[in-house]
Amino acid sequence: PFNVGGLDKFGTLN
């Protein structure tokens, strides 16, 4: 996870 509560830069759910 890179962006908490959304999509990270790989497009995976956090």
UniProtKB/Swiss-Prot annotation:
Pathway(s) it belongs to: Aromatic compound metabolism; phenylpropanoid biosynthesis
Tissue specificity is:
Expressed in stem, vascular tissues and tobacco mosaic virus infected leaves.
The answer, when asked if Hydrolase is one of the entry's keywords, is yes
**A GO BP term, please?**
phenylpropanoid biosynthetic process
Annotated signal peptide: none
The reply to whether Hydrolase figures as a keyword in the UniProt entry is yes
Q: What induces it?
A: By pathogen infection.
Disulfide cross-links: none
> What molecular function terms (GO) are annotated for this protein?
hydrolase activity
Which enzyme class? hydrolase
E.C. numbers: 3.1.2.-
Question: Keywords assigned by UniProt?
Answer: Hydrolase
Q: What is this protein called?
A: Feruloyl-CoA thioesterase
User: From what organism does this protein derive?
Assistant: Nicotiana tabacum (Common tobacco)
Taxonomic lineage is:
Eukaryota, Viridiplantae, Streptophyta, Embryophyta, Tracheophyta
